[in-house]
UniProtKB/Swiss-Prot annotation:
Tissue specificity note: Expressed by the skin dorsal glands.
Function: Has antimicrobial activity against L.lactis, L.innocua, M.luteus, S.aureus, S.epidermidis and S.uberis. Probably acts by disturbing membrane functions with its amphipathic structure. Shows anticancer activity.
One GO-annotated biological process of the protein: defense response to bacterium
Protein known as: Aurein-3.1
Main subcellular location of this protein, as a coarse class: secreted
UniProt signal peptide: none
Record keywords: Amidation, Amphibian defense peptide, Antibiotic, Antimicrobial, Secreted
Domain of life of the organism encoding this protein: Eukaryota
Modified residues (Isoleucine amide): I17
GO cellular component: extracellular region
Subcellular location: Secreted
Length: 17
């Protein structure tokens, strides 16, 4: 769902830090 997309984006940002 939409929250899965949010989590995926958040995970990408977390991996970029």
């Amino acid at each position: 769902g939409l929250f899965d997309i949010v989590k995926k984006i958040a995970g990408h940002i977390a991996g970029s830090i």
